[in-house]
From Swiss-Prot:
Name the UniProt record assigns to this protein: UPF0301 protein RC0043
Organism field: Rickettsia conorii (strain ATCC VR-613 / Malish 7)
Record GO cellular component, one term: cytosol
Signal sequence bounds: none
Family: Belongs to the UPF0301 (AlgH) family.
Superkingdom of the organism of origin: Bacteria
PANTHER family linked: UNCHARACTERIZED PROTEIN YQGE (PTHR30327), UPF0301 PROTEIN YQGE (PTHR30327:SF1)
Amino acid sequence: MGDKIFHNLSGKTLVATPHVITKGIYHKSLIYMLSHTEEGAIGLIFNRLVNHIDLKSFFKIKNDEITTPVMVPIYLGGPVEHEKGFFLHSSDYNKNLLLDFHNDLAVSSNLEISEDIAFGKGPKNSLFIVGYTAWKPGQLEEELETNLWLVMDCNKEFIFADNPESKWHNALKHLGIDEIHFSSQIGNA
């Protein structure tokens, strides 16, 4: 048996396979892959809307110029470190980036972006996501081999679509998959 070839999925989207992941946080999830190396992987679920927050009060923005609440949706990025918040956003905003993917997406995690969004000076598109998803070395590869995930190229339209409930179905449609006809008896040839 030879060594397995590593395929870096950073900047790709994972689509939960229909009928395989049937409950919990990963059921019908879409995950944008922030980092994928032989040491493990990190991603953000971007279709789990949990609430709306006022940026001004959430980030304790002390500015009298903002007199009304600035409500933004808040998404659950995964089961790890819910106290950490990230903005997955379009690359038109490039101040103090945490990650820049060179595919029209970036990630920020600082107070400055929240203030800029509150003042209307932030990125054209953004999602505020708390928590993240992480895999140990080899864990994601094992999940891919057992067909828990489909992989698709990054698609900003899916990430920033207005209706989070339809994102997963639209991703399947983009991949040419009809959920009704997708077999739960899948495997590798």
